[in-house]
Amino acid sequence: MEGLSFGPLSILPSLAEELNPHRVAFLTNTTVERLWLEKAAEGIEEPIRIVIPDGEKYKSLETAVAIWKRLQEEGFTRKSLLIGLGGGVVTDIAGFVASTYMRGTLLGLVPTTLLAQVDAAIGGKTGVNFNGKNMIGTFYLPNFVLIAHETLSTLPEEEIRNGLGEVAKYALLDRKVYALARNFEGISETLIRECALFKVEVVEKDLGESGLRRILNLGHTAGHAIEKLSNYRIKHGLAVSMGLMVASKVGEELYGFDSGKTEELLKKLGLPTGHPFRAEEILEEMRLDKKAWYGRITFVIPVEIGDVVVEEVDEAVLKRALEATRDDSGSGDCQKPGGSA
């Protein structure tokens, strides 16, 4: 597994130096360039700086081609280090570029959003969008991931909530994270660390997502469908939150799971507990999900806190869960994180 480090940006030069790279290049976006690039690059000799526009639409093959060209022009080699500094879009495309340029270069990731720190930057998944989200990608472990808590200080409230959707997922998967999250009063380094370490533990056992790693898709089958139906106006973490509630209702019917625990947790984190779409709309999207097998919908189902199963679910069960969690108010029953449940 990649080297996971927790600390300030000031330790980045030493992490890079350990790899003895031929050159160092930073890949970031326009927002993070303004906020953090100068500080991150301090102490690194004449780094190449590659800045892409903000936004999911720039996670594309066209962007990757432009980065490959720039690296080639700069004399970047397999012994050079590409550092992805930014949120999930940046870390995904940095990993994809590093894994494909000259069949693989050195790679470091410095995630600057909560979503990336607890999930997107960990585990070696890379990708670009191509007629769908992450349809072209690789598995490629970075040489290091630096989680610098300071970078969250400039993160807007909506991006904190976006990341909390993944925190809620880990809380249902791991009792230690659940204990921290149900007493949530604000983002702590301990909470981020426990989420990240849980994912590392799972990925180490199943890098290629052939078995155990599939539990990390909890909330994502319905979540991705909701995200897509909203034309991505509903952010990923909020869609995952809605998906967690759907999965919990499935678990309640099939295994007697207490879905009230999920609802209480989501409210504590200021996350939505309902979705705005018709059940059949979501079912249709779930049938197209890349996690479906021959159109059959595979679901991660909570049995109890810290225990899930992965199995095909009858569509009648899914439909009942989707209908039970529909919320037409537009609010999804949200409140500010840390509020009483």
UniProtKB/Swiss-Prot annotation:
The keyword GTP-binding does not apply. SUPFAM superfamilies: Dehydroquinate synthase-like. Its EC number is 4.2.3.4. Pathway: Metabolic intermediate biosynthesis; chorismate biosynthesis; chorismate from D-erythrose 4-phosphate and phosphoenolpyruvate: step 2/7. NAD(+) binds at residues 54-59, 88-92, 112-113, 125, 133, 151-154. Gene3D superfamilies: 3.40.50.1970, Dehydroquinate synthase-like - alpha domain. Zn(2+) binds at residues 166, 220, 236. One of its GO terms (biological process) is chorismate biosynthetic process. InterPro entries: Dehydroquinate_synthase, DHQ_synth_AroB, DHQ_synth_fam, DHQS/DOIS_N, DHQS_C. One of its GO terms (cellular component) is cytoplasm. Its main location: cytoplasm. Pfam families: DHQ_synthase (PF01761), DHQS_C (PF24621). Its cofactor is NAD(+); Co(2+); Zn(2+). It is an enzyme of class 4 (lyase). The keyword Lyase applies. It catalyses: 7-phospho-2-dehydro-3-deoxy-D-arabino-heptonate = 3-dehydroquinate + phosphate. It is found in: Cytoplasm. HAMAP family: DHQ_synthase. Catalyzes the conversion of 3-deoxy-D-arabino-heptulosonate 7-phosphate (DAHP) to dehydroquinate (DHQ). Belongs to the sugar phosphate cyclases superfamily. Dehydroquinate synthase family. This is 3-dehydroquinate synthase.
